[in-house]
Each structure stands twice: as C-alpha cells, then as structure tokens.
Design a protein with these regions (language model features):
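Core SAM-dependent methyltransferase catalytic element
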Residues: 257-282
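Short alpha-helix
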Residues: 224-241, 247
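A short acidic, Gly/Pro-enriched loop at the edge of an enzyme's catalytic core
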Residues: 128-139
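A short SAM/SAH-binding and catalytic strip from SAM-dependent methyltransferases
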Residues: 139-151
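Class I SAM-dependent methyltransferase SAM/SAH-binding core
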Residues: 72-76, 80-129
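Conserved class I S-adenosyl-L-methionine
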Residues: 2-68, 82-86, 168-209, 251
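A short glycine-rich, Lys/Arg-flanked "PGG" loop and its adjoining helix->strand segment in the class I
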Residues: 153-165
C-alpha cells in the first residue's frame, strides 16, 4: 500500500553539489541489482517489443528502422543497459554513460547476454560532463534520467553540445515525485497505488522501503521535482539551441501495461523530441 506523505512547497537550499552527486551515485550503486532485475523482466515481456517500436520509430521514422544501422547514439544514464540492447540489436553504434559503476557492470552483463556488445562502449562519468568532442552524435537518448539532474539546464546544454547539427534528442521521463510537493496529486496517488500487484513485476524488481524513502529525500533536493513537465522542457529547450521541440504526454500508453498506467496514473511517462538547430544562432 502506498504511504501518505506530507508535501512541502519549496525546495530546500542547495547543498554542496559534489557531496550530493556522491549521494546519488551511492544510491544507484545500491539499487543496481533490483533495477537490473526490472530490466530483465522487461526483456522477457511485452515491454521489449513496445519500447523497441517506440524508440526506433522515433530515431528513424521513415525507414522501417533500416537507417538506424551505423548511427552513433549516446545513451545518457544507461542504467542496466535496456536501451543498449535495443539499439545494438538494430545496428547502432552506442556510447552508454552512467555515473554509477555498479550500473555499468550490470549493463555490461545484460548487453553481453541479450545485445550486441561489439557495438556498445561504456563510460562511467557524469552525464553533465561528457568526455566527447562537440557535434559527434547523431542521436542522444535518456530514460528516467532528467528528473535526477541537479542542474537540468547544464545537462541539456551539454547534450546539445555533443549532438551533430540536425541531430535528435529523445527524452523519456515523468513527474515521478510531484506527489512530494503537491497534496492533491499525493491523495490521488495513494488511491492509485493501493495494490502493487497490478504491476505484475517480479518481487526482485522492487526497491526496498528504505530505498524508496532515500530516493524521496533525494528528489526533494532536485529542481525538476518542483516543475510541471514536459511544459518546463518545452519552454527552455529552444533557448538552448533546440528546434522542433515536441512532447507526447500520452507516451506511457505505448509502452506501459494497463496495470502500470493505472498505478502510475499521477505520473504518466512523457516523450520529448528535439533537434539541434542546423545553423548557429546569431
């Protein structure tokens, strides 16, 4: 049963960024096993086909995915390697970045079993400080990552830097922790999340109660917890040099089961597509 939570209205003062980043990495290092289990579940059910269709159709909308072969794709916050499996199977050359060394290890193992490891290169580093030259990637993707950014404008600016002119950015995320700062959303969530069995996930995929509390504490210190998205993203991306910014607020209907859509009814998954402008702004 979902627990009640007393919402706060304003973010606390920013803490030391380096210390906070270490806390985030430590959290995901400790979550890597259960998070990898959830990815393994997705590989074996309807999620894999749904995500493959949704992701590849956005990368190559007019080519029946044939043109994805050879594309240089950067996955930001790769976690246990779900996108790496999809993308490497389609022939993309994938660079996978995550700040958690344990997540990278899980991803390596999962890609070795289910993907094409010859096409995947892993980098353990911060997604806002990338070890790549400018304008080198055809596509950048991220799933369930942007909400975690202490400085989301810095993150988007860095991702824009490494994209080729005309390259595409695909962001999949949700207002995961809006219930912490909105009492009305929290009350709706409590009803939606009364029974987790509707998710039909394996027991090994769930975070522990302690991990959930720790993640909530981190979320309260992150700026995007206090924004309404994807409206916020749509408002800032053009100023960073992105064109053709589009958001799909019903994206979860394409990749989630009915149970997941019900359980996470207050935080549906959205998709953002944006293109790096081909000409430099004056």
């Amino acid at each position: 049963m979902a627990k009640e939570f007393t919402a706060v209205k304003e973010p606390p003062a920013a803490s030391d960024e380096a210390v906070f980043r270490r806390e985030v990495v430590d959290y995901w290092d400790k979550r890597s096993d259960t998070y990898s289990n959830s990815i393994k579940d997705e590989l074996g059910d309807v999620h894999f086909g749904a995500w493959s269709e949704a992701l590849l159709s956005r990368i190559c909308p007019c080519s029946a995915y044939a043109a994805s072969e050879g594309l240089k794709v950067l996955d930001l916050g790769c976690g246990p390697g779900f996108f790496e499996i999809i993308l490497s199977r389609s022939g993309c050359s994938v660079h996978a970045v995550d700040s958690s060394a344990q997540m990278i290890e899980q991803a390596r193992a999962n890609v070795s079993l289910s993907g094409n490891p010859a096409l995947v290169e892993f980098h353990c580093c911060d997604v806002t400080e990338l070890p790549f030259d400018a304008s080198v990637f055809d596509v950048v993707v991220s799933r369930n990552v942007t909400w975690l950014m202490p400085d989301p404008l810095k993150a988007y600016s860095e991702w824009h830097r490494v994209l080729k002119p005309g390259g595409k950015m695909l962001v999949f995320d949700a207002n995961w922790y809006s219930y912490l700062v909105d009492d009305q959303i929290n009350q709706l969530r409590l009803g939606d999340q009364d029974d987790s069995s509707i998710l039909e996930w394996s027991e090994q995929s769930f975070a522990t109660s302690e991990q959930e509390r720790r993640c909530e504490a981190l979320a309260l210190r992150l700026p995007l917890t206090y924004e309404r998205r994807p409206a916020w993203d749509e408002s800032v991306l053009p100023s960073l040099g992105f064109d053709e910014v589009r958001a799909d607020e019903r994206f979860s209907e394409l990749v989630w089961t009915e149970g997941e859509q019900s359980y996470y009814g207050t935080s549906p998954l959205f998709a953002i597509e944006a293109q790096k402008a081909c000409l430099a702004r004056a």
